Amino acid sequence: MLTIDGTFACASTGLEIHMIGTASHAAYPEAGKNPGPALARLLLEIEKLTEEYNRSRGFVRMTLIGMDIGSANYGVAASEGTLRMTVRAEREKVFAGYVDEIKQIAQNTADDGGFTLDIQEIERFPATENHAVNVDKLRKCAADQN
């Protein structure tokens, strides 16, 4: 029997953050809205948020999975982009707040740039947290059986 105090498995979810701007000819990028710079700033803001959470609220992690901006069409400035990441946290309450703050930062970034925003959560899993009292009861029962 395996027992562990505290968290056995972190809460986690994939996040797909998609921003849509306005296309323009590559010769006139100022006529469109390219989400590339906004997504880059968003990634940096999420990294700062992650550091702050780790300092003050407990273990969280953001793993960048990928970022796609535009397409291989050299005559058109990018008008869409997607940031993909996996986020996790040791405690469920911390995780919920962390994910909510990421979504709020994404919304603020999209609003500031005039982008349409779509956020998808992919395969959200709750934390598996073992409460000390219950772990102690389990250990006592196991010891009584030996």
Predicted regions and their residues:
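Metal-dependent amide/peptide-bond hydrolase catalytic core
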Residues: A27, G36-N146
